[in-house]
Amino acid sequence: MKLSSTVAALAAVFAIGAAAPAWSQTKTIYIGMNGGPMEKAYTSQVLPDFEKANNVKVVVVPGTSSDVLAKLLANRNSPQMHVVFLDDGVMARAVSMGVCQKLDDAPVLKELYPFARMKDDIGAGVQLGMTGIGYNTKLFAEKGWAPPTSWMDFANPKYKGKVVFQSASSSTFGLHGFLAINRLMGGSDQNVEPGFSKWSTTVGPNVVEYIPNSAKLSEMVQTGEAGIFPLTPTAVGDLQDKGIPVGYANPKEGAVLLLVDLCVVKNNADPQLAQKLAQFLLSAPAQSKAAAAGKQIPTNEHATMTPAMQKSLGNLDDLVKKVTVVDWDSINAHRAQWDQRWNRQIEQ
C-alpha cells in the first residue's frame, strides 16, 4: 500500500512537472508607441500591472506615429504588433487603410470623454493633448513681456525674430498652429487660402526658423533664439523637467485637440489579449499612473492627475470644452497639396 502510494505521489509530481512549462509559459504581446518619455512612463509604471495580472510580457516597439504606421502597412497580413498608439491625424490614415479592428464593447468606453471615442469605436483616445503656445519664460521676464494669450500673438511685431514654428508639412504642432491662425484669418479646415496668402505679411516676418520637429527647441530656448512656439502642455512639462525655462499658455481662442489614439491591430496573433490590453490602457487606474509617471493627460473622466498637473492645466473639464477639434478627414484629403505648398511658399 505504501509503495503504491509512493508511486502515485511520484507520478503526480512528474505530471505536474511535465505540465508546468505549458501553464507557466509567459506570452509576449507587442505595443507600438512613441519612444522617450511616453515609453519610459508606460514601461516603468503602467504596463507592469497588466503583465502581472495576465502573466504576459508587454514589449514596446518605439517609433513616431508615422514609423509605427509604416511597420503596420509593411506587415498588414501578419503584424508583429497587437496594439498601437498613433497621433490622431496618423490614426485617421491608419483607419482609412484598414489596419485597425473595432474595439470590443466594454464599460470603460463609457468612461471616456465623448470626443475620445472614434467613429464606430474603431479606436479611442488614450492620451489627451492640446497644441497651444509655448514660450521662453526667461526671455519674457527679461523683456518684461506678459505671457502670450492668443494665436495671433505669433503675428505681433514685438516678437519679430523670436518666433520658432515647426514645419506644418512634417509636424502636427506646426500644422495645428497654422490651422488655428488660418481660422482666425477667416479660413477653415477645408479652406486654407487665408492662412497661406496672409502668412508672409503676418506671422512670416517674425519667424527666425522653421524646424522639422520640436527636438531643437530646448537648445533654441537656452540660447535665447526661441521666444514663442506652438507646443503642448506635456511637451512643455518634459522640457521643464530638464530645467529648460519654458511655460505653456492656453490661447483664448482655444487650444487645438491633439489626441494620442489607440487601436487593436487587425489580423494580430492574439486578438482577445490585445482587446484586454486596450481596455486596460483606457481604464482610470492605468491612465492615473500614466499621468503621475509621464504627465500624460487622461481621456478617462475618472482618472486623476497630480496636483502639479492640475495647477498647470486648471480644470480639465473646463479646458476640454474650449478645445478646437480639427477635421482630419478633410485635412488628410488635401495634406499632400498643403505640404507641397508649405515647403514651396512658406519655407522657400
Predicted regions and their residues:
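Early extracytoplasmic/lumenal segment of secretory-pathway proteins
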Residues: 25-92
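Extracytoplasmic ligand-binding site segments that recognize negatively charged/polar headgroups
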Residues: 36-43, 80-81, 85-219
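A ligand-binding cleft/hinge motif common to bilobed small-molecule-binding domains
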Residues: 89-93, 222, 227-245
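Short beta-strand->loop
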Residues: 101-110, 123-124, 152, 228, ...
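Periplasmic-binding protein-like
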Residues: 129, 197-203, 210-211, 242-266, ...
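A bilobed periplasmic-binding-protein/Venus flytrap-type ligand-binding module shared by bacterial periplasmic
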Residues: 134-139, 182-184, 259-271, 289-290
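Mature extracytoplasmic/periplasmic domains
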Residues: 265-323
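Extracellular/periplasmic bilobal clamshell ligand-binding domains
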Residues: 307-348
